[in-house]
């Protein structure tokens, strides 16, 4: 093969179905040879292309890509649309190429995740001038095994090839990458600085910044410390007012960042921050509850318990309870203490009783959530539970939502392990939470993808549109590794966590070279931006699988970056760092 649009080409505008194609023992080379293996189709006719095998092919040079899969071919062509084409089970093995612009290109479509199960194994491409792997729109389950470009192994996240990592720690590398992308922390989470010039108060910022805080504690770096401290400095005034916080919303999401603020305040204590922390705790004292005593997720989500909300509220309550009891914030006074606080460093018997009551309430809430969201058929936990069984997304008999969203399960597992961080060793009900953690994470292992080591976005559905998702995968990995380190879990959980972390690096971490010559950044890819249920004014958020698949996927979602940092710090305790890859 010396010329043409491709050495092996499947399809075009009228491709329809193609399957069981074998190409092997071929030689190709020409500056006019556009591609080695090309699959092209679009939504005009749809169809399914599958079971394509290319092996033992030697290529001198090609003009564009060694492999290109394009299901968005001729997107402006005037024709009837809406027929989704699927491409899957494509193998390229033992293929060499000495010159090209790209290694692998995949052009998906925005509507569906229709390109998947693509394998490149034992392939070597040299003199790739632009990018080893370029992906556009949606695709998943892309597997690279012993795939070398310009002498370096390439993972399936589409990394640029770099000679050496600028940091030994992936946690430092990600932290400094995020600081470079977002110079001011009040604008994390893709916040529009024009619409929100004062920034946003959001649980999302707190999660990522707390991961950075722990990176600082592990590795130092005054720049990291200064960066994380800018958030409370800018968002909380000296009189304790928080920009964007509305007590009357009774929104558990707004409490999560208090967990970060409480810890960070020790670096530069400020009275205004302490006043704000009391206000957040006061919300928890007065938060509306279901008839069984579990917090509503938000005022607008009345009578509803979400796995998300357990993480947003209960770890902060557990951590802050001893301090708040000393400060006189009790259920009886609704968080507004009368008189002077005790100056004694020790709790009185009455205060100890109040503190134990707080702990009991925390364990009661998480165990009730466990019972109400657990699905015996799958061994998983549903995203949410409507205690009145009346919401449009809820099962009328059980009150449960339809599916298990992986990130909701991630919130639930992180809530458990963080509650254990602060429940005293001698607290009578501590073992209940440890047992729950074992049960929850064992279920996670049961649903861990054996090929990639990570997890799918909707855990209880097998469908070609489902995709491996990074934020939940980072959460589970963090909990598996930390739980094993602290002795809550046996070594099988640690091994699952190690497998998962390597899967994160191979499938989700992309290295981005910088045109200005500064240090290459890394990105966490394939994170779903959001998924929720309702409220009534948002009927499209109905908890169906189609709904979950409709939410956008993006890079560097802070809800994944924070847990990635925590998972990385756990792996570093086991001796793993960037030198394991470079």
Predicted regions and their residues:
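Extracellular/periplasmic carbohydrate-active domains that bind, remodel
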Residues: 1-162
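Oxyanion-binding "anion nests"
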Residues: 22, 28-33, 411-460
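CBM-like carbohydrate-recognition segments
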Residues: 132-134, 163, 169-206, 218-225, ...
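Long, well-ordered core segments of solenoidal/helical folds
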Residues: 169-188, 226-244, 275-294, 335-339, ...
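Acidic/His metal-coordination segments adjacent to aromatic residues that form catalytic metal sites
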Residues: 236-243, 291-299, 388-402, 455-465, ...
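Extracytoplasmic mature domains of secreted/periplasmic and thylakoid-lumen proteins
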Residues: 247-312
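Aromatic- and glycine-enriched pocket-lining scaffold segments that form the walls
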Residues: 294-385, 393, 409
């Amino acid at each position: 093969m010396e010329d043409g649009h491709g050495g092996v080409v499947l399809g075009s505008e009228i491709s329809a179905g193609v399957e069981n194609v074998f190409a092997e023992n071929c030689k190709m080379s020409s500056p006019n040879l556009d591609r080695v293996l090309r699959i092209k189709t679009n939504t005009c006719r749809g169809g399914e292309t599958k079971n394509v095998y290319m092996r033992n092919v030697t290529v001198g040079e090609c003009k564009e890509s060694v492999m290109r899969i394009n299901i968005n071919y001729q997107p402006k062509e005037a024709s009837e649309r809406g027929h989704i084409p699927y491409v899957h089970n494509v193998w390229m093995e033992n293929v060499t190429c000495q010159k090209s612009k790209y290694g692998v290109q995949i052009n998906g479509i925005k509507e569906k995740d229709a390109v998947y199960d693509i394998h490149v194994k034992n392939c070597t491409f040299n003199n790739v001038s632009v990018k080893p792997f370029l992906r556009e729109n949606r695709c998943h389950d892309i597997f690279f095994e012993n795939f070398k470009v310009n002498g370096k192994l390439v993972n399936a996240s589409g990394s640029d090839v770099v000679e050496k990592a600028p940091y030994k720690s992936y946690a430092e590398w990600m932290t400094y990458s995020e600081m470079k992308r977002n110079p001011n922390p009040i604008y994390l989470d893709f916040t529009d600085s024009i619409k929100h010039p004062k920034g946003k108060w959001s649980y999302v910022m707190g999660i990522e910044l707390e991961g950075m805080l722990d990176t600082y504690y592990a590795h130092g770096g005054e720049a990291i410390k200064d960066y994380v401290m800018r958030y409370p400095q800018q968002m909380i005034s000296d009189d304790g007012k928080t920009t964007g916080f509305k007590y009357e919303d009774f929104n558990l999401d707004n409490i999560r960042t208090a967990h970060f603020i409480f810890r960070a305040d020790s670096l530069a204590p400020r009275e205004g921050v302490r006043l704000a922390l009391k206000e957040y705790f006061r919300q928890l004292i007065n938060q509306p509850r279901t008839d069984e005593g579990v917090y509503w997720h938000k005022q607008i989500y009345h009578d509803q318990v979400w796995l998300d909300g357990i993480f947003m509220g209960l770890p902060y309550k557990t951590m802050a309870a001893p301090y708040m009891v000393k400060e006189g914030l009790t259920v009886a006074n609704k968080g507004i203490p009368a008189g002077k606080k005790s100056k004694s460093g020790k709790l009185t018997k009455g205060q100890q009783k109040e503190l134990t009551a707080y702990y009991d309430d925390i364990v009661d809430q998480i165990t009730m959530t466990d019972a109400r969201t657990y699905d015996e058929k799958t061994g998983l936990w549903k995203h949410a539970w409507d205690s009145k069984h009346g919401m449009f997304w809820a099962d009328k008999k059980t009150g449960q939502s339809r599916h298990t969203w992986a990130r909701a399960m991630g919130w639930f597992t992180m809530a458990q392990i963080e509650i254990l961080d602060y429940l005293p060793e001698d607290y009578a009900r501590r073992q209940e939470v440890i047992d729950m953690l074992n049960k929850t994470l064992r279920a996670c292992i049961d649903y861990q993808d054996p090929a990639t080591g990570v997890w799918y976005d909707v855990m209880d559905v097998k469908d070609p549109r489902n995709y491996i998702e990074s934020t939940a995968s980072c959460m589970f990995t963090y909990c598996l590794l930390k739980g094993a380190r602290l002795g809550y879990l046996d070594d099988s959980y640690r091994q699952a966590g190690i497998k998962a972390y390597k899967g994160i690096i191979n499938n989700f971490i992309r290295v981005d070279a910088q045109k200005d010559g500064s240090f290459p950044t890394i990105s966490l890819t394939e994170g779903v931006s959001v998924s929720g249920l309702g409220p009534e004014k948002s009927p499209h958020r109905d908890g169906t699988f189609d709904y979950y698949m409709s939410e956008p996927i993006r890079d560097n979602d802070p809800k994944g970056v924070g847990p990635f940092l925590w998972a990385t710090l756990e792996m570093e305790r086991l001796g793993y760092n960037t030198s394991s890859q470079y």
